[in-house]
Amino acid sequence: MAKGKDIRIIVILECTGCDQKSVNKESSGISRYITQKNRHNTPSRLELIKFCPCCRKHMIHAEIKK
């Protein structure tokens, strides 16, 4: 039985490479992914390596605030 409904939350992951390139206007946008995380198992910010279509390579995507 679940102890609470707010254990799993929806988070947005944003590419860290696109954020740095937007100053130089090299990329056309910012890549974002939507996923879930368990707040009890991972209380810190989530960072995953995902494919960025703007950079055209695998980059680190970090959790952002809503």
Swiss-Prot record:
GO BP field: translation
UniProt keyword annotations, A-Z: Chloroplast, Plastid, Ribonucleoprotein, Ribosomal protein
InterPro entries, per database record: Ribosomal_bL33, Ribosomal_bL33_CS, Ribosomal_bL33_sf, Ribosomal_zn-bd
Cellular compartment(s): Plastid, Chloroplast
Ribonucleoprotein recorded as keyword: yes
Location, primary (coarse class): plastid
UniProt-recorded Gene Ontology molecular function terms: structural constituent of ribosome
Gene3D superfamilies noted in UniProt: Ribosomal protein L33 (2.20.28.120)
Family to which the UniProt record says this protein belongs: Belongs to the bacterial ribosomal protein bL33 family.
Protein name (database record): Large ribosomal subunit protein bL33c
Lineage: Eukaryota, Viridiplantae, Streptophyta, Embryophyta, Tracheophyta
Gene name tied to this protein: rpl33
